Amino acid sequence: MQVIIISGLSGSGKSIALKALEDSGYYCVDNLPASLLVILINHLQTQHHSHVAVAIDMRSGDSITVLPWQFKMIDKSIRTEFIFLDTRTDTLIQRFSETRRRHPLSDKNITLEEAIQHEREVLATVSDLGHHIDTSSLRPNALRAFIRDFISDSRDPSQLTLMFQSFGYKHGIPLDADLVFDIRCLPNPFYDPHLKELTGHDLEVIRFMEAQPNAAKMLGDIGSFLDTWLPVYMQDNRAYLTVAIGCTGGQHRSVYFAEKLALHFRDAARVLVRHRGLAEYNQYYARR
């Protein structure tokens, strides 16, 4: 039996993620009180459900605070994954404004921003239970793609998920980054008129980067650092590790580095790649 638990801030994309799992054949339960998690799983196991997804959030009230304990009480024979969706406050305010939806914690006595902050503080107790995903700049189809890749990975579920994420500093550091490497000191293909409109996926940019001695040295140093410390992270029983590579715009250098590193570590962990700065590539995909 496989169980995927989804939690996160209101407006972060939980409904989209749950619908993607339902479309993939999962038996889905939305807005479950956290205190009923183990009871539900045990019941569904007796009903021979093999794939189950459950969404638990602040709509269930203060019972969300017991989720860490409930999570630990799940039978160890059941493959269990936890996904926490996070989003920047300014993005959440914009989403609620555009959809004209009411935040579940808002009332006439507090502002929307205050409601979001309160929810963030309460959910801090559960945000580190598993895969922490920043959906601030993630489009719905990209979130669906991440879910599809996540459930299609047949590797050992206890194996650490290693995510390489390229980004542009002009849009801020990703919320879900565990390690951040700044490569803005390297020559920028953006200033070459022939490369300006291309990306780190294009052969011309790849050749440009490969011709830079410092780029090769920095790539090797980052790879060596991860070669040394990745086993230590694994021994710490971490479920995931997000490595963010940042350049100015997230179009050329960081994309090249993320792809190279993902290729290097594809046999060492469950590897995912995301290019936050590329609209057409703003999605997660598995590197196999």
From Swiss-Prot:
GTP binds at residues 57-60. The keyword GTP-binding applies. Pfam families: PapZ_C (PF22740), RapZ-like_N (PF03668). Keywords: ATP-binding, GTP-binding, Nucleotide-binding. Coiled coil: none annotated. InterPro entries: P-loop_NTPase (IPR027417), RapZ-like (IPR005337), RapZ-like_N (IPR053930), RapZ_C (IPR053931). ATP binds at residues 8-15. One of its GO terms (molecular function) is GTP binding. PANTHER family: RNASE ADAPTER PROTEIN RAPZ. NCBIfam families: PRK05416.1. Displays ATPase and GTPase activities. HAMAP family: RapZ_like (MF_00636). Belongs to the RapZ-like family. This is Nucleotide-binding protein Neut_1559. It comes from Nitrosomonas eutropha (strain DSM 101675 / C91 / Nm57). The lineage of its organism: Bacteria, Pseudomonadati, Pseudomonadota, Betaproteobacteria, Nitrosomonadales.
